[in-house]
């Protein structure tokens, strides 16, 4: 790929789905972009399995960027990220997991990464519609370039994952980053409950305060004491899948 990239490169970018014939090229690119070695089965899956959204950005016929994501049920989220969504969401609620997003070095800062991410969002809106409540990913704590990219696009750090990666036999820490969409949100903290109750009280008329306080207190107690006599929804078990 040429080192000379025109300033109008984005206008010449075309998007298409990855296919089996791209495997050799994306193996080279992933080797340049990521410190993790993916097995051959991974490349086969992302280019043939319809459960993956695998999109290539091409410039004059050559791949210069790609994004790979999977839209799945919240019950398929790995254990360490099981609390991405509040338990109040139905079990069939979906999330999107970004497995890979990369752009050839010479083509960075031309908007290609944003184009790929926006294409994923558009795909979600047309397939999962409003059933998908979050987009999330994992990143090395030392990958400041990627962290800044996602933070500038409203992703928030959700978890610190010590020793999450094994890179050439060395354990490395990671972060989980999440972008909430379509009304998605994480489990509430005690401060969220206090803020919610305070906002509710501020909007009440004086004569309705006693009943409203009782209902708010009952809901708060239910959230913290699921073993009490107050009925509560059962928790969801999360399984690790690939």
Curated annotation (Swiss-Prot):
Amino acids binding acetyl-CoA: 101-103, 109-114, 143, 150-153
Active site: 97, 138
Protein name from the UniProt record: N-alpha-acetyltransferase 60
Location of this chain's protein in the cell: Golgi apparatus membrane
Region (Required for homodimerization): 162-173
GO biological process, any: N-terminal protein amino acid acetylation
Species the sequence originates in: Danio rerio
Alphabetical list of InterPro entries matching this protein: Acyl_CoA_acyltransferase (IPR016181), GNAT_dom (IPR000182), NAA60-like (IPR045141)
Protein topology in the membrane: Peripheral membrane protein
Keyword Acyltransferase: yes
């Amino acid at each position: 790929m040429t080192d000379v990239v025109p300033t109008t490169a984005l206008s010449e970018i075309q998007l298409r789905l990855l296919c089996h014939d791209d495997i050799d090229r994306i193996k080279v690119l992933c080797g340049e972009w990521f410190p993790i070695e993916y097995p051959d089965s991974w490349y086969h899956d992302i280019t043939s399995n319809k459960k993956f959204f695998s999109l290539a950005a091409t410039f004059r016929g050559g791949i210069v960027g790609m994004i790979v994501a999977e839209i799945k049920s919240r019950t398929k989220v790995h254990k360490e990220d099981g609390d991405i969504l509040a338990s109040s969401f139905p079990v069939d609620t979906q999330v999107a997991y970004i497995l890979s997003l990369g752009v050839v070095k010479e083509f960075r800062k031309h908007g290609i990464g944003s184009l790929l991410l926006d294409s994923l969002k558009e795909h979600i809106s047309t397939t999962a519609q409003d059933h998908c409540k979050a987009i999330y990913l994992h990143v090395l704590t030392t990958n400041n370039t990627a962290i800044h990219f996602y933070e500038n696009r409203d992703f928030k750090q959700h978890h610190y994952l010590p020793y999450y990666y094994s890179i050439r036999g060395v354990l490395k820490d990671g972060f989980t980053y999440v972008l909430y969409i379509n009304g998605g949100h994480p489990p509430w903290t005690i401060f969220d409950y206090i803020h919610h109750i305070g906002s509710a009280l501020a909007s009440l008329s004086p004569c309705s305060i006693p009943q409203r306080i009782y209902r708010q207190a009952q809901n708060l107690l239910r959230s913290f004491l699921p073993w009490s006599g107050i009925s509560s929804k059962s928790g969801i078990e999360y399984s690790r899948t690939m």
